[in-house]
Amino acid sequence: MALAISSEDTQVLLKDKNVLHESNVDKYRTAGQITQTALRFLAGLINDSYHHRTRATPLSVAELCMLTDSFVERCVRQAFANKANERGIAHPTTIDVDEITQGWAPETDDAANMERWNRDRQANSGSCQGARSAISGFLHEGDVVKLTVGCHIDGYTAQVSHTMVVYPTTRREADQALVPAGPLLGAKADAVAAATIAKESVTSLLACAQATEKLPAAFGERQVTGTLIRRVVDAVARSYNCAVVPGSRVRRVRRFLAGQNEGVVAERDIKGVHWTEAHQEAALLASSVETTDVTRVDASNKSANDSAVATDDFVVVSGEAYLIDLKIAPLKDLPRGLLTLQTVDHFSGKSHRKDELLARASLICRDFAKQHVLKLKSSRQLLHKLDSKGVYPTKLAHLTAAFPLDPESPDWDAVSKELKHLRLGLAEVTNNYLANEKPVQLCRLVPWDVILKAVNPTGKHGTDASNPTLPGYEIPLPQLGISSLRLKSLLKDSLPVPVARESITVLLCPAEVTSTGSPELLKLTGGPTTTPSWIHSDYELNVSDPVVQGILQLAELSKDKRFGLAIRETQPWKQKIPSAAAVTSADVEMA
């Protein structure tokens, strides 16, 4: 069932409401301030629990998520109290460890279930220990932790993701303070470095859309296009012996359309660069001599729904908002293979690997295109609460009366008690597709020799309906004829891969809404709160690559305050938050 919207309403919702007036920029800026303040708050809680060790018992991942969401909710309620119809959490706090790519935001009552579901699981001896931290509920030394927070004011969304490292600590002789024992080394450090540099490079590249005459000649382009964005990110990943994980994106965001329902909602006039398995397949075939006669698809044969299919054929223009969300995985000491995502569920008895993680999704998103009369009273009550949360993902804990929690004395028992009642109605709501669960996903590498030896007798059109994909990318490997169901069956021969993630939201502000009277790029998130962790990579940018030469020129332009790129950062609120929020030596400049 699809929503019928008139052309007049479409003009208002997709065009008029997305013009960057001063009032809209203020809402974007406020959402960015709240998001960055919340990220600083979350980083402080982690530092106090796992670095400074000022707490007798460290906070669990579920408690960290809940306290941060409560902090965001309290801040949002203070902003635009009488000027915005809707405001709240746009992305519940997720804390993804190592190979867990996205979606890990456990409820407070999941700890006992995680141990029960995974009691027969065999521990993984490799460097990826995300499953270990997920089952125990606590972070461990050496974990690469991806923190994601987001909020919105009247549908104008700001989101940030930052990769943080949990270091082993030692006492400093001068003052006996706990400090990191040393930088992060190895493959994980390569991924963190590549993600950070790629994020900053794309930010500077988008700023060139405001002044195309400053676009480096090494790129061979006169406009900032989707193709150029992909070339820049791929060049950085190659230099650090890494690859871009499927699900990464640099896309335009609009009011209430921030990419939170990709694969479920076919967004009209979508603009963005998306990385999928099909792009890895194309790169493999392009590097093979035997594939010079690959049939190419004529782009002129467009269907009626092509506006919902994301392609690189677009130009970045002033007056738009963009989400830069990059996930990078290292390839060091790994065979050549395909990076793909594995969806986690809590069903046992499957004939899969013995080290597979079992867990249930926590993020829920209402689908307003579906209507159904529910039978259970608890289901109807839950649906009413979900309707009040709008189109953004939420958690059952956010629907309890105890939310938001008091950070000084949180009532965890009250939340757990209400969760039992809410779970009774969740099954009927999701079974009738009134709400969609956003899955927990792991990054896995399937060797190419396994894929090339696989047969697909059911045909390449056997799609996996349980995992929605972007329109136009239903077949993960179209040229090799591998369907999503067949690729899913090959995951039993895959390897876990750690992931680093960096994401920010930026505005391309026209001259009419800036204080300087000239166009500028406004970083809503990703300012001083996303300082890179202390790492050391064995790789560096390949200066012989023309694209890398352009990237280095972009870096110089971003530093030139007078003649370079006009980039302004949104600062977090200077309000008093717990002392845990101070950034310590665990977040120092990259070595």
Curated annotation (Swiss-Prot):
Keywords: Cytoplasm, Hydrolase, Metal-binding, Metalloprotease, Nucleus, Protease. Its main location: cytoplasm. Its EC number is 3.-.-.-. It is found in: Cytoplasm; Nucleus. It is an enzyme of class 3 (hydrolase). Belongs to the peptidase M24 family. Probable metalloprotease involved in proper assembly of pre-ribosomal particles during the biogenesis of the 60S ribosomal subunit. Accompanies the pre-60S particles to the cytoplasm. This is Probable metalloprotease ARX1. The gene is ARX1.
